[in-house]
Amino acid sequence: MELMRIVLVCLVILLFLYIILNYYFTKATTLTKMFDGTKRQKILASTLPTNTNSSNYTYSTWFFVNDWNYRFGEPKVLLGRMDEDKQPSPSIVFGAMENDITISVACYSNDKSNKSIIHTCNVQNFPLQRWVNLIISLYGRTLDVYIDGKLVRTCVLPGVAKVNSHANITVTPNGGFSGFTTKFQYWNDSTNPQDAYNIYKDGFGGSILGNLFNKYRIKVAILSDNKENGSFEI
């Protein structure tokens, strides 16, 4: 019992240090901190660094899906930047039943009409119950999707992406998902594979302790007659 108490005290101290370091050393492009995935956040367009109408951009965020049964059967929005016509530029949505990701982008049509084309890019089977880094990078008509620093999908858009620099970004609206989000970042330029890998290696805390918590988790189990009745992870 004494050893267990020492371990728990050390964990509390490490967690406290991680929170303090994460608070003071977050990069300027980092627009969100650790937040409940079931709660709605709004990122004002005015807070985006070098925010322009350029169709070349990069979004990066970290998320942890804890319980996939939460809102099972309903699409779960990770983030959305909707223009005045409620069209995505872009939106990122988790699947209703499968652990898939759908990225939607409104594009200009090739004809002279003002009608938009909504293009979707899908990524299947993203990891659950661990921290995941998702990066979407758009250059011209090419949309690259990175998970944990690796390029997993490239989609070719039917037209140039629409961007409304005045549109705010909403994170996990309508109940979101069971878990957490953190370290949302934005750049007004595309990202190459090396940059994407560097973003991932920087960790969701941007510190040594952040990388430590990204790599390791602790499971606490509740036993009754040596049988596990419940557990939780930190």
Locate each region found by the language model.
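Extracellular glycan-associated modules
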Residues: 1-234
